[in-house]
Curated annotation (Swiss-Prot):
FMN binds at residues 103, 111. The keyword Manganese does not apply. CDP binds at residues 15-20, 116-119. Belongs to the archaeal riboflavin kinase family. This is Riboflavin kinase. Gene3D superfamilies: Riboflavin kinase-like (2.40.30.30).
Length: 136
């Protein structure tokens, strides 16, 4: 089976810190280890897409199968499902684009997880351009 690769370019942007909260929840930590093969750093790297081709590729992800982290019910809350796509960012892997079922981000903003603190590993600051390869 051949892997299809989508390319998405964008610029690093600051988030609200919500990724850190969700990636500290044991259910998500264990699920990402199980389904993606790595324990994610407790935070996401947010990327804003600014070109047409990258945005079209991002929209393809809405229709693509991806890896589904199922919804999880706890006594006081429901943890929403997440669709994930194995990826690399500036040739660093493992990484994954994560698309939560419930998000406040527009389609032009994507979230990346990795076992690494990507801002440090790639020496990134807000406004820096990155290239993501998404493996379908």
């Amino acid at each position: 089976m051949r892997t299809k690769i989508l390319h998405i370019k964008g610029k690093v942007t600051a988030g609200l810190g919500e990724g850190r909260i969700f990636l500290s929840i044991p259910y998500y930590i264990e699920s990402f280890k199980k389904y993606l093969g790595f324990e994610p750093y407790a935070g996401t790297l947010n990327i804003v897409i600014y070109d047409r081709i990258s945005l079209e590729n991002r929209l393809i992800l809405d229709l693509a199968k991806g890896i589904i982290i199922p919804e999880h019910k706890e006594p006081n809350r429901v943890l929403g499902s997440v669709k994930a796509f194995p990826s690399s960012i500036n040739s660093i892997s493992p990484a994954a684009i994560v698309i939560p079922a419930r998000t406040t981000h527009p389609k032009s903003v994507i979230e990346i997880i990795s076992p690494y603190y990507l801002r440090e590993k790639l020496s990134l600051k807000d406004g820096d351009e990155v290239e993501i390869e998404v493996y379908l």
